[in-house]
């Protein structure tokens, strides 16, 4: 097969992978824009990761998304790592360059802010503190993005205090760590509230942080998107807050990779959202 006729391949690697909505999303975009290409989900064990990444370009892959548990590991296997991916310590988007080098980026943070700007257009991140629950890879991406858009203070609470303290040491003085038992007491005057934990996800423990101190002017978002309407979002909406579900972050973080692999910047709109939910 010549370079002129090769159909570009992309995909998502992780383990497990059956739950991923990425194939439905990229498949929809390929069809919508009439593009030649395929997007393939691959269940890759940790022990096979290095060999799989080495083989993918030879198989015609131009890049891939990366999900749990490989987002941290691929940083050490990439030749070029963007500053934001290095700061976050994880990559979700790989590009296999023609010179043989693997380029790693993290678009989770920009996906997060794009989701809020689209679905809460009045959001003013500079207007007050942000509360972030959780201290994993998603929290790192969110905190990096919040700092970039000018949030003056970030109040961080995590069930493991040590992980939160480690995150603060990486991101600096804007991040203030609080014990998990205080997770509901740090909401007063917060203008942005973000759950990055798995609490409230299907099959996980329920989200039970008390929201009595929630500022009704706050924008509240939950990165969980299964279910779309989590307990946090239902209670925050009842308190008068603008709420944003987590599906939009998934859609927006995918757009830069799709553009690099297939040459078209895809729209993230209601039609896209409906197609992914229907899959």
UniProtKB/Swiss-Prot annotation:
One Pfam family hit: Shikimate_dh_N
Entry keywords, A to Z: Amino-acid biosynthesis, Aromatic amino acid biosynthesis, NADP, Oxidoreductase
GO biological process: amino acid biosynthetic process; aromatic amino acid family biosynthetic process; chorismate biosynthetic process; shikimate metabolic process
Catalytic activity as recorded in UniProt: shikimate + NADP(+) = 3-dehydroshikimate + NADPH + H(+)
Domain of life of the source: Bacteria
Residues that coordinate or bind NADP(+): 83, 134-138, 223, 246
CDD domains for the chain: NAD_bind_Shikimate_DH
Alphabetized SUPFAM superfamilies for the sequence: Aminoacid dehydrogenase-like, N-terminal domain (SSF53223), NAD(P)-binding Rossmann-fold domains (SSF51735)
Pathway: Metabolic intermediate biosynthesis; chorismate biosynthesis; chorismate from D-erythrose 4-phosphate and phosphoenolpyruvate: step 4/7
GO CC annotations, alphabetized: cytosol
Catalytic machinery residues: 71 (proton acceptor)
Similarity comment text for this entry: Belongs to the shikimate dehydrogenase family.
Quaternary state and interactors: Homodimer.
HAMAP family named among the record's database cross-references: Shikimate_DH_AroE
Record's protein name: Shikimate dehydrogenase (NADP(+))
């Amino acid at each position: 097969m010549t370079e002129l006729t090769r159909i570009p391949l992309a995909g998502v690697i992780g383990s497990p992978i059956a739950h991923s909505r990425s194939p439905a999303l990229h498949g929809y975009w390929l069809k919508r824009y009439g593009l030649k290409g395929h997007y393939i989900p691959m269940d890759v064990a940790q022990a096979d990761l290095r060999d799989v990444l080495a083989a993918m370009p030879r198989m015609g892959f131009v890049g891939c998304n990366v999900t749990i548990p490989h987002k941290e590991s691929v940083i050490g296997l990439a030749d070029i790592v963007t500053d934001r991916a290095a700061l976050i310590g994880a990559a979700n988007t790989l590009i296999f360059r023609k010179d043989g080098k693997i380029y790693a980026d993290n678009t989770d943070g920009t996906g997060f802010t794009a989701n809020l700007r689209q679905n809460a257009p009045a959001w003013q991140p500079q207007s007050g503190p942000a509360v972030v629950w959780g201290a994993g890879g998603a929290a790192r991406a969110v905190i990096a993005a919040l700092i970039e858009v000018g949030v003056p203070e970030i109040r961080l609470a995590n069930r493991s205090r040590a992980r939160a303290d480690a995150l603060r040491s990486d991101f600096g003085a804007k991040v203030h760590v609080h014990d998990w038992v205080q997770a509901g007491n740090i909401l007063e005057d917060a203008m942005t509230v973000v759950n990055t934990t798995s609490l409230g996800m299907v099959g996980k423990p329920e989200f039970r942080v008390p929201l009595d101190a929630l500022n009704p002017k706050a924008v509240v978002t939950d990165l969980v998107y299964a279910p779309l309407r989590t307990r946090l979002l239902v209670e925050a909406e009842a308190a008068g807050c603008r709420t944003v579900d987590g599906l939009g972050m998934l859609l927006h973080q995918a757009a830069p990779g799709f553009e690099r692999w297939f040459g078209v910047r895809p729209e993230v709109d209601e039609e896209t959202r409906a197609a992914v939910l229907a899959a």
